[in-house]
Amino acid sequence: MKRKLDANNVPSPEDSAGKSITAHSFETLKLDPRLLQALTQQKFTKPTPIQAEAIPLALDGKDVLARAKTGSGKTAAYLLPVLQSILQQKRNTPAHKSISALILVPTRELAEQVHRTAISFSAFSGKHVRSVNLTQKVSDAVQRSLLADLPDIVVSTPARAVANVNSSALSLERLTHLVIDEADLVLSYGYEEDMQSLAKAVPRGVQTFLMSATFTSEVDTLKGLFCRNPVVLKLEEKEDEGAGISQFVVRRCAEDEKFLLTYVIFKLQLVKGKCIIFVGDVDRCYRLKLFLEQFGIRSCVLNSELPVNSRIHVVQEFNKGVYDIIIAVDDQEVLGELRKNSKKQPRKSDQCSRDSEYDGAQTSRNNDQYSSEDDAETQPSKRPKKSAKEKDYGISRGIDFQNVACVLNFDLPTTSKSYTHRIGRTGRAGKTGMALSFVIPSDQFGKHKPTSIPSAKHDEAMLSKIIKRQDKLGREVKPYHFDMKQVDAFRYRMSDALRAVTRVAVQEARAREIRQELVKSEKLKRHFEENPEELRQLRHDGELRAARVQAHLKHVPDYLMPTKGRGSLSIGTGADVGFVGFKKTHENVIRKAREKNKGRGRGGKAGRGGKRVDPLKSFNSGGKH
C-alpha cells in the first residue's frame, strides 16, 4: 500500500508505535545471551529511547532511518541487531563465512570507535564474530589479506570502501546489512561520488540503517540511494542536546585577554574536571599549548595534521582520565562545514557561502532545532581548500568524549550549528556540563596582531545568532563576569609568557610535535598489544619546549592569589606563609655555638672532654721536671 506524501513530497513514516512495543530492558529484546553478557560487562543497564525503538524494528528486518541527538546511543542501536543477525546465521550454518555488514562513517576516529565497540559487544562470542577497520594505516597487502579472510563486519570510510571494492579486495555479494552512521555528514565531507559507486555495488535486499543527528537534504539523498520504504524515527527526547549544559559568554574580551583568562581559569582551578578547548586553527592550537606550558599547565593537541593512530590514542587516553585538557581544532567546522561540491558547480566564495548552510527549508517541519534564520550566517569571505587529510577528520561530531566537564570556546565557532555540536561534547548521558565562550568586540578586533584571527571579526554577529537559536530551544546564554581587578594582577605574567611564544616557536613546536607523533604512531601500531608497558612513553601532553622557558612563571606567589583562593594551589602551606612574629621559632645557631665552646681556652687539649690544665703550674724554665 502506498503512503501519502507530506508537504515536502516525502512519504509519511509508518506509525511504528502501534506495531512495536517499546523495550524497557535489553532482556525483552530477545538478544543472544552472549550479547546480554557483554552489555552487562559494559554497564548498559537499560536501552536508551533510540535503542528501544530501533532495535525491535531492525530485528524484524526493516530499514531504519533514525534521527537522535549526539550521544544518545545510536551506535548500539544498529550494532546489536547486526551482531544478533550474524550470531543467528552462525548458529544455523556454522561453516558459513562471508562479509555480512558494511558500516560507513565519515571520519577515521569514528571508524575506530565503532570498531572497538563492535569488539566489546562480541567479547563473549569467541571467534564467531570478526570485525575489520579499513581506515587503519596498514599496507595494501595486509589489508587485502584481512579482507580475504572474510570478516563478518567491515568498518570504513566511503573512500576506502570504494577503493577496496574496485580492487576486488572487498566482496559485497553476500552483504546483508549496510549502516551509514552520521549520515548527514557523509556527503558534506565530500563522499558523494563514493556513495553513488557503492549504491551500484551493494546488492538489492540489503537491510539499511541510516543514523543521523539531523534530517537534511543529504539524508534524503542517501535514503533515495540505499533505502526501500524505511521506518522513520524522529525521537523528541525530553532532555535534548544541551539541556543540562550551563552556557556562559564573556562578551567584551580583548584578543590577548583570551590567554589571560584561560591562564586564570586553569591556574586558579575555576573549572574542575576535564575540559575541551576549541580554537580556530592549528597555529593557535600550538600557541595556546606553548603558552600554558609556561605556567606548568599540561595539555595535548588534537588536529588533522597528527597521525590517525595518535589522534585515536589521544581520545582514548582522555576518556581514561590520563589527560585533563585537550586543545582541539575541528577543521570541518572551521571551514564552515563546507560541502564538497561537484566539479560542475562554481567555486566562488559567495556560492560556497550559500552552500555551506543546508538547514532551513530543506529540513522537515518536525525538526525545529534549526531555524531558517541561520541559513545565512556570516562566514569569512575566503576559505582554504579542504585537503584530503582534513576530509576524514572531525571532532565536534561523532567522537565519544566521556565525562567532559567544560567546553571552552577559545575562538567562537563560525556557525550557530557548530556551536550546538561543540557544546554537545559535555553534559552527556544525563550529566551536567558547562560551556564558556570568548567574544571579541568589533572595536577590539585586530589590535593585538600576534593573537588576532580573522574569524573573530564576526564574533558579535555570530553571538547574536547563537543566542537567538538557544532562545528558541528554551536555553539561556548567561554572561560570565570576571573580577578584573584581581585578574589584572596576573597580566604581567601573561605578557611575559605570551612574548616568549613567537611565530618561530609555534612553527618549531608544530614540526616537532608531528615528528614525535609519527614515531609514537609506529610504536602504537607495532607494539601496543605486545608491550602494554610502553603506553607510559606515549603521553601526548608532554612539553614541546619550543618557547623560551621561564621557570618562575610555573609558581604563583601567594600575594597574587585572591583572598578566597589563597593557599589553594600550594600543598602543605598554611595561612601564615610570609608571617614574621615577635618570638623566634628557631634557635640561634651562633649563640648555640658560643654556649658550646664556652670555657674552652687556647691552651686546652684539642680533644673534647679532656682535663683542663693551668699553664702557670706546668711551666718549667729548666726544661726538666
From Swiss-Prot:
Keywords: ATP-binding, Helicase, Hydrolase, Nucleotide-binding, Nucleus, Ribosome biogenesis, RNA-binding, rRNA processing
GO cellular component: cytosol; nucleolus
Domain Helicase C-terminal: 260-485
Molecular function as annotated in GO: ATP binding; ATP hydrolysis activity; RNA binding; RNA helicase activity
UniProt binding sites for ATP: A68, K69, T70, G71, S72, G73, K74, T75
The species this protein was found in: Ajellomyces capsulatus (strain NAm1 / WU24)
Protein's name in the database: ATP-dependent RNA helicase DBP9
Biased composition (Basic residues): 599-610
